[in-house]
């Protein structure tokens, strides 16, 4: 009797292997399995945004002009959110609101949900692309982990916040001036600048910018001479064995400046990763809190004293009055369907007026 020992082999024409070979082939633009999610979603999100900013009005949802066709420019055009009355409807083209009518779908704000959802999945696909490529070339996955910060901010601001409110109407519209309006809304209705999570986010983003500037300048300052003056772009190559700059010199310099300095490149670069990503995640957590209408810091004692004493005012109490003004003016303008009317005497006035 003959016993054959060997490994079971798949059919040569296995569909998965064929797809895997084609998707992960070495080409100018890597596709990969993540590309099946990234490329279609990014295409539809960008295409929807360009279509909306070029042709689609916001008259039916916000009472505004928002397209190039109506006279807007790059800074004022936007794909605006659906009307407040549509709540959290996905606004599918074939749904009960538009009933397959593309023009009606655009008028109702269907492009916003289209761009928001495809944009979110495109960002997730881009993160998966970094995971996939890192695994293919045997890198650690910190690029993908870092990109989770922008994804967290996008999802919290554009999806989770309006889900916690009465509808998509209260999310930001996709446009430059529209985002600015949303920032003013956040300040007026949530006192966002006094929120500790916003403070951590600002510290993370600006701290990362500072670290990046310091790091780049320090490396440029400590380049080894190579016979070509200060320019090392032609003298050094990617596979060189020696270092391009002197970490020891950089350490001595900053030790004299601050009294402390990074002595380890790994800790230095991890810190440059940790600061901005943590800041973005903290901001995202703060926005999730705002979705639930959690309040920022309140210094009630100062408000009470300012109300009782006309001569007492702080920057905090002035900002609270400013927030009241934002709410009074923005609510009437931004939610015309509510028919809000504020008489002159109820609009906030500071003690100095």
UniProtKB/Swiss-Prot annotation:
The chain crosses the membrane at residues 41-61, 125-141, 153-166, 208-228, 279-295. CDD domains: Photosystem-II_D2. Pheophytin a binds at residues 130, 143. Its EC number is 1.10.3.9. Fe cation binds at residues 215, 269. It catalyses: 2 a plastoquinone + 4 hnu + 2 H2O = 2 a plastoquinol + O2. The modification Phosphothreonine is found at residue 2. Keywords: Acetylation, Chlorophyll, Chloroplast, Chromophore, Electron transport, Iron, Magnesium, Membrane, Metal-binding, Oxidoreductase, Phosphoprotein, Photosynthesis, Photosystem II, Plastid, Thylakoid, Transmembrane, Transmembrane helix, Transport. One of its GO terms (biological process) is photosynthetic electron transport in photosystem II. The keyword RNA-binding does not apply. One of its GO terms (molecular function) is oxygen evolving activity. The D1/D2 heterodimer binds P680, chlorophylls that are the primary electron donor of PSII, and subsequent electron acceptors. It shares a non-heme iron and each subunit binds pheophytin, quinone, additional chlorophylls, carotenoids and lipids. There is also a Cl(-1) ion associated with D1 and D2, which is required for oxygen evolution. The PSII complex binds additional chlorophylls, carotenoids and specific lipids. One of its GO terms (cellular component) is chloroplast thylakoid membrane. Photosystem II (PSII) is a light-driven water:plastoquinone oxidoreductase that uses light energy to abstract electrons from H(2)O, generating O(2) and a proton gradient subsequently used for ATP formation. It consists of a core antenna complex that captures photons, and an electron transfer chain that converts photonic excitation into a charge separation. The D1/D2 (PsbA/PsbD) reaction center heterodimer binds P680, the primary electron donor of PSII as well as several subsequent electron acceptors. D2 is needed for assembly of a stable PSII complex. This is Photosystem II D2 protein. It comes from Lemna minor. The lineage of its organism: Eukaryota, Viridiplantae, Streptophyta, Embryophyta, Tracheophyta.
């Amino acid at each position: 009797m003959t016993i054959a020992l060997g490994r079971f082999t798949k059919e040569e024409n296995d569909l998965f292997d064929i797809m895997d070979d084609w998707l992960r082939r070495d080409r100018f633009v890597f596709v990969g399995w993540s590309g099946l999610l990234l490329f279609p979603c990014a295409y539809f999100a960008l295409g929807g945004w360009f279509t909306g900013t070029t042709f689609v009005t916001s008259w039916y949802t916000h009472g505004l002009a928002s397209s190039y066709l109506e006279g807007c420019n790059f800074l004022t055009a936007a794909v605006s959110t659906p009307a407040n009355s549509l709540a959290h409807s996905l606004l599918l083209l074939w749904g009960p609101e538009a009933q397959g009518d593309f023009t009606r779908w655009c008028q109702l704000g269907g492009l916003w949900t289209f761009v928001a959802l495809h944009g979110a999945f495109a960002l997730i696909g881009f993160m998966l692309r970094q995971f996939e490529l890192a695994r293919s070339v045997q890198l650690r996955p910190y690029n993908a982990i870092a990109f989770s910060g922008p994804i967290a901010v996008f999802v919290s601001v554009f999806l989770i916040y309006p889900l916690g409110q009465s509808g998509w109407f209260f999310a930001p519209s996709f446009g430059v001036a529209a985002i600015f309006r949303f920032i003013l809304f956040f300040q007026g209705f949530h006192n966002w600048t006094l929120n500790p999570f916003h403070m951590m986010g600002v510290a993370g983003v600006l701290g990362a910018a500072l670290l990046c500037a310091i790091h780049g300048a320090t490396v440029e300052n400590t380049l080894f001479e190579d016979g070509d003056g200060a320019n090392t772009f032609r003298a050094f190559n990617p596979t060189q064995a020696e270092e391009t700059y002197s970490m020891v010199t950089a350490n001595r310099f900053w030790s004299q400046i601050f009294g402390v300095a990074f002595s380890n490149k790994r800790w230095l670069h991890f810190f440059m990763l940790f600061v901005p990503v943590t800041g973005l995640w903290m901001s995202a957590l703060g926005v999730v809190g705002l979705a639930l209408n959690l309040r920022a810091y309140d210094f009630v004692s100062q408000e009470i004293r300012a109300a009782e004493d006309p001569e007492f005012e702080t920057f905090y109490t002035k900002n609270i009055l400013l927030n009241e003004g934002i709410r009074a003016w923005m609510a009437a303008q931004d939610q015309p369907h509510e028919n809000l009317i504020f008489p002159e005497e109820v609009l906030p006035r500071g003690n100095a007026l």
